[in-house]
Amino acid sequence: MGKDFFFYRLYVYSNIMKIGLVMNVKLLKNLAFLGLLSFSVFPSFALSKIIPDGTIPYNMGVQLKGDTDGPEDLDRVQELGMKWVRRGFIWESIEREKGVYDFSQYDRFVNDCEKRGLKIIGCMAFSNKLYGHVKDEPARSAYADFAAELVKHYKGRNIIWEIWNEPNTMTFWGRHGKVGNSPQYAREYTDLVRAAVPAMKKANPDCVILAGSVSNMWSESYKWMSYCFADGMLDIHWDIWSVHPYGVKAPEDYMEAYSHTRNLMKKAGGDTGRLWINSERGFPLGKAEGYAGGDPSLAYEYQAWHVIRQYLVDLLEGLPVTIWYEWGGKEGFAL
């Protein structure tokens, strides 16, 4: 019953999205009337062309991976009503020989997305064994070169570029430190952003760059962001700060988490009106009991509720894009 069950769930999610969008429209109208809702101001023309201004449903998307990015999956994503996809652009798969870049496998994906009107968050990941870890030279400069080649090659396409995935964690930044969310990890990541952003802007002045990609919204990740801000992160000319709001049981709790993060930026002397994106948030079906909360037998219902509630929260908080993790896969998060 695999395919039939998928389309049944697709039908259910489509109706959930429709219900949620109606709720959003009514809620947004009421809040706008009350003067409680503030819309983002775009800092550049290039940014305003690709990032929606809060128009429903043009700011909802889903995470894809290499085994779920084919035409059939993209057709289903489009049918569900999503307008964005997030996917890794893996450095090692593009630069297998120093200084030689092969974009062919990603060209197909970008073209397929473009045909379906899907915009892309391209996560530029990870270190390359040709150079070593990006915390050190020459890998840091080589990553900046790779990022510059990416934005040059895909200039004019509907892609925004995220520097790394969850660099505050040992899982994705490395186990050379004793613990994640450390001052060391913050300093190393800030140095990478400091190297990559000027190279990218030189190669393509109109490219849109996301920094942060922060995993979880809790005390330790707040500390990590503060370390980044203290190291000069807010002085670098990236365009959008991206977060992955995991760590609490109810999406509504992220309103307080977002507020706290804005206060951290303000305390560090940063622009609290700078754009944000939720570039990853999911609900684990296989772990419904625990940090996600809820009865495992109701996992699918809880996941559906979380999709809509997270989307509503992000809209209310002025986040112009929400990416749901994930479309498929075996981690237990798949829609």
Report each predicted region and the residues it spans.
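Bacterial N-terminal signal peptides that target proteins for export
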Residues: L21-A32
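Bacterial N-terminal signal peptides
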Residues: A32-V41
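Boundary/entry segment of secreted carbohydrate-active catalytic domains
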Residues: L47-K83, G88-I90
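Structural recognition of the beta-strand scaffold that forms the well-ordered cores
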Residues: N59-L64, K83-F89, I120-M124, I159-I163, ...
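Substrate-binding cleft and catalytic face of glycoside hydrolase catalytic domains
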Residues: D73-R76, L80-L234, P245-V248
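Aromatic-lined carbohydrate-recognition surfaces of secreted/lumenal glycan-active proteins
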Residues: L192-Y222, A268-G286, L319-G329
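Substrate-binding cleft/loops of secretory-pathway carbohydrate-active enzymes
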Residues: V214-S242, P284-G294, L298, E331-A334
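Aromatic/acidic polysaccharide-binding cleft in carbohydrate-active enzymes
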Residues: G282-L335
